């Protein structure tokens, strides 16, 4: 029996769904190029054969450096079908980091988006990079193959031997390495995690257990393809379920695309959901008193009903009647901004604030939160019929979870990675006796739903010995319209302070006073030793370019503190304040 690999999942779907649409790539001219499932499979076969023709063998690393687009998917599946190790690189990193990651992957070939990107990488990395096999997904350049030319080479191989592809793919085993994931570096130095075909297919097979999606549904891909959430949930699981994927042309065009495509499934990081919320509340703030009262009254009613349903309690008929009115007058218009057809709205890649989750539940579009990581795959998800706000859900089939004595979440699962590429010491630190030590501090409720309360490495211990988890407190600011980001400070210090960035759309003459009120509101929900005593508003937002954010917009706490060390010092001069 042939090994079950990522390619065999595509092969099964091509047989099942045939000419049905699989991928929709924008042409830049207001139209889309559509690939059917059979065309998707054919492209993967041709690319695999083409890679062999240019000397790329089983076990060789092939890097992918591109924004998320259909050609990335084709190249990825072709590389995997060839038995190559596919290493996706973040395009948003500084050039020097991109070059370092490319070299660390030991790639022999690079699929790259366009000539400009290729020239920039070679310029940053020097002549040695020019010796790699460069394959352009779009455009043409001297010293590089185009994707079309590679596919032509593959077709020639198939013309010469009709079973050329079958011979190539027969070499691939389920236990063979399939992908290298670059960790985000949010909690340490970036590393590359090696994941096998068996681990990926195990994760793919979990999809139908939690997502009731069919070929009549659709989704939009816009997250970085180097991120595990995008790779598993929006690239690989759709293959198993026959789900068509539409690709966003750019983040700037995403709001328009949402209304035009009207997806039924959307995965986005909390930052996207926060921005939608902030834009709605900023707009409401500018309206008259009656409109504001209607909006906040409707949200309050929706939140009350959502809470009753979450707790399994009956909802009075009178409230259900009012909710229908609120939905028609208020909530349906908010959902229309996102196309109006979303059945499953998922949040991933970073923790979601409980208050933000309650807002979306109130408007009839509950955010389903899950949990995954480079080293473990996607292992938890909220049941669609009974999600719990603030929880990452329950374990997926085949996954075991337990807590260490200090509350660290441990995972045993067929989806676990094999280890960090070329770093056995780092691997041994996180994989012990078949269990993955995640570094996340967690709790279980009575129904075995999981709640992440913080990162082990981010724990703040004050000079008085009090333990504070900053992530839990920072999440409380997510529904404050004036606040963009908050980073807490206080490790080995006498009290807690914060660096704050504000929402540009909400800035007024009274911004500092508004921030002070927001801090006071959050402080009322905290123990005295957790309360923020001083804060400083930064003149700019955190950025990927300055190393303060990961590509999925998670804050790199240590880099933020390093970049603003003078301000941090000022926060601990003079007398302690209260907010």
Ranges and model annotations:
Residues 34-38, 178-204:
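Conserved AMP-binding A3 loop
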Residues 201-218, 225-331, 341:
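Conserved AMP-binding/adenylation subdomain of ANL enzymes
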Residues 266, 306, 326-450, 456-459, ...:
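Conserved AMP-binding/adenylate-forming
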Residues 29, 116-174, 280-333:
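ANL superfamily adenylate-forming
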Residues 2, 19, 23-73, 77, ...:
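Conserved AMP-binding/adenylate-forming core of the ANL superfamily
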Residues 18-21, 152-182, 189, 212-218:
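Conserved pre-ATP/AMP-binding loop-to-beta segment of ANL
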Residues 485-488, 494, 521-579:
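Conserved C-terminal "lid"/linker of ANL adenylate-forming enzymes
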Residues 93, 110-112, 403-405, 413, ...:
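AMP-binding/adenylate-forming catalytic core of the ANL superfamily
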